[in-house]
UniProtKB/Swiss-Prot annotation:
Species assigned in the record: Simian immunodeficiency virus (isolate CPZ GAB1) (SIV-cpz)
Swiss-Prot/TrEMBL keywords: AIDS, Apoptosis, Host membrane, Host-virus interaction, Ion channel, Ion transport, Membrane, Phosphoprotein, Transmembrane, Transmembrane helix, Transport
Protein name: Protein Vpu
Modified residues (Phosphoserine): S56, S60
Localization annotation: Host membrane
Membrane topology type: Single-pass type I membrane protein
Gene Ontology terms, MF aspect: CD4 receptor binding; monoatomic cation channel activity
Gene Ontology CC: one annotated term: membrane
Cross-referenced InterPro entries: Vpu (IPR008187), Vpu_cyt_dom_sf (IPR009032)
Topological domains, Cytoplasmic: 24-88
Gene3D superfamilies listed in its UniProt record: HIV-1 VPU cytoplasmic domain
Extracellular side of membrane: 1-2
Described function: Enhances virion budding, by targeting human CD4 and Tetherin/BST2 to proteasome degradation. Degradation of CD4 prevents any unwanted premature interactions between viral Env and its receptor human CD4 in the endoplasmic reticulum. Degradation of antiretroviral protein Tetherin/BST2 is important for virion budding, as BST2 tethers new viral particles to the host cell membrane. Mechanistically, Vpu bridges either CD4 or BST2 to BTRC, a substrate recognition subunit of the Skp1/Cullin/F-box protein E3 ubiquitin ligase, induces their ubiquitination and subsequent proteasomal degradation.
Domain notes per entry: The N-terminus and transmembrane domains are required for self-oligomerization and proper virion budding, whereas the cytoplasmic domain is required for CD4 degradation. The cytoplasmic domain is composed of 2 amphipathic alpha helix that form a U-shape.
């Protein structure tokens, strides 16, 4: 009987450990996905702004620049780069 209780406790512990590991993996993957999505959006906006700057007849109203600054600020904050000298 004691052996059975011990085996059940070990099994419960292994299941709990497995849940913790999978939770960490899912959390890490989600953070990586968010960072990739943010980097892609920054690159896309930067490309749009460069193309618009090269095309002299097409001026922006500043919304993309503000959005790009906000995305870069969020990217730096999320990656623990908090240097006030580089604040936009």
């Amino acid at each position: 009987m004691t052996l059975l209780v011990g085996l059940v406790l070990i099994l419960v512990g292994l299941i709990a450990w497995n849940i913790c590991i999978w939770g960490y993996i899912i959390k890490w993957g989600y953070r990586r996905y968010k960072r990739h999505r943010l980097e892609t959006e920054i690159e896309r906006l930067n490309l749009i702004l460069r193309e618009r700057a090269e095309d002299s007849g097409n001026e922006s109203n500043g919304e993309e620049e503000e959005r790009l600054e906000q995305l870069i600020h969020n990217y730096n904050h999320n990656n623990h780069f908090a240097n006030p000298m580089f604040d936009l």
